[in-house]
Amino acid sequence: MTRKQKRLAVIAGGMGFIIAAVLLVMFAFSQSVAYFYMPADLAKTPVAPETRIRLGGLVGAGSVVRGAGSTVEFTVTDGSANAVKVHYTGILPDLFREGQGVVTEGMFASAGNVFIADTVLAKHDETYMPKEVADKLKAQGLWQDGQGAQSQAGQGQGQEAKATR
């Protein structure tokens, strides 16, 4: 091989390696991306069954029904007439309760309009609301900055209680 052919082979091998690495990274990201929706968003734009999403809003008042074992059903609402029924099997965060901010991650069942959650994130304290949920509620005029009592010295800001199956 001449010097020019060796250089061309090294460049071609390097480009092949870079292309393979980019494709692997793109594949990994496409498998882990979960888009965020509120119940009103789902009413406008339905999501295909078995597509992973994050569903955020407030736990509906009077909607929490505990089943056998650690099975729980509740609704997530955004303050409007839109609500999504959620089915979760696992231990809920200690701070989970009706009227609290919540973000669930999972997918819709292939049959019916029930959201099957495998992760539940609960609002940490009375002043913290997950940014995604707060932004959507602000856009609808249902949330204002400074809602709730001030926490002691900003304690707990930016933290979420998390439960996963």
UniProtKB/Swiss-Prot annotation:
Heme binds at H124, Y128. Belongs to the CcmE/CycJ family. Heme chaperone required for the biogenesis of c-type cytochromes. Transiently binds heme delivered by CcmC and transfers the heme to apo-cytochromes in a process facilitated by CcmF and CcmH. The chain crosses the membrane at residues 8-28. This is Cytochrome c-type biogenesis protein CcmE. Signal peptide: none annotated. It comes from Rhizobium etli (strain CIAT 652). The keyword Cytoplasm does not apply. Residues 1-7 are cytoplasmic. GO terms for cellular component: plasma membrane. GO terms for biological process: cytochrome complex assembly. It is found in: Cell inner membrane. Its main location: membrane. Residues 29-165 are periplasmic. GO terms for molecular function: heme binding; metal ion binding. Residues 144-154 have a biased composition (Low complexity). SUPFAM superfamilies: Heme chaperone CcmE. It is a single-pass type II membrane protein. PANTHER family: CYTOCHROME C-TYPE BIOGENESIS PROTEIN CCME HOMOLOG, MITOCHONDRIAL (PTHR34128:SF2). Residues 144-165 are annotated as: Disordered. Pfam families: CcmE. The keyword Membrane applies. HAMAP family: CcmE. Keywords: Cell inner membrane, Cell membrane, Cytochrome c-type biogenesis, Heme, Iron, Membrane, Metal-binding, Signal-anchor, Transmembrane, Transmembrane helix. It comes from the Bacteria.
